[in-house]
């Protein structure tokens, strides 16, 4: 089967001209992290790259579906769905798509003063675990947004926007836990405040026969939602918690 570098149906591929990259590397505002090129290859069948001398940039590859592999320092690594890796600059490497389950990848070549530090922090194949707060869709949407901007032109403002924004994208890979919590910290704080209100209401009703229905009704929630939220935040069913409060009071 033929080996293909690019040209996949539905692909996106943008490479900045040499002079644009040089200008960015000499611009103190963005010089520490500069995008060379970015792209998206969906269902990249027969994708294969062999760089015997490496390349002049660092390379981030994020597999969002399917499977691929890469070889670095004589070791072969498998790259499953929702995993990413970074290849260092100037080092021989090969990478490609699985023959049986071709990968879908977002990728970016980048350079600058921070590039080596970023690469050193993100070695090997790194998972992006799925959970309710994974924000995988947010990261992909941001990749697509940067590709849109890359396609829109090479004026200074556009290039600066891409390079400054790329810092945020890299941060989402470097600090996955923080990236996830950033979006949900407000709702977490709101839930904590709600629990304090609920327990205060319980305290005021220790002499009464409070029911889950009455508790939920007081806050305008359904009984099932009230139960789930309270249990999630405290580890106790609401009425069991209320019973413990009564026992402690006695």
What are these model-predicted stretches?
Residues 108-109, 113-117, 121, 131-203, ...:
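An amphipathic alpha-helical interaction segment
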Residues 1-34, 51, 128, 149, ...:
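A short, N-terminal "cap"/entry segment at the start of jelly-roll beta-barrel domains
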Residues 21-23, 30-125:
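N-terminal regulatory/effector-sensing and dimerization cores
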Residues 197, 201-247:
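Basic/polar phosphate-binding segments, predominantly the helix-turn-helix DNA-binding elements
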Residues 71, 96, 158, 181-185, ...:
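Short, hydrophobic secondary-structure boundary micro-motifs
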Residues 27, 52-53, 187, 191, ...:
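Residue-level marker of regulatory loop/turn positions in helix-turn-helix DNA-binding domains and
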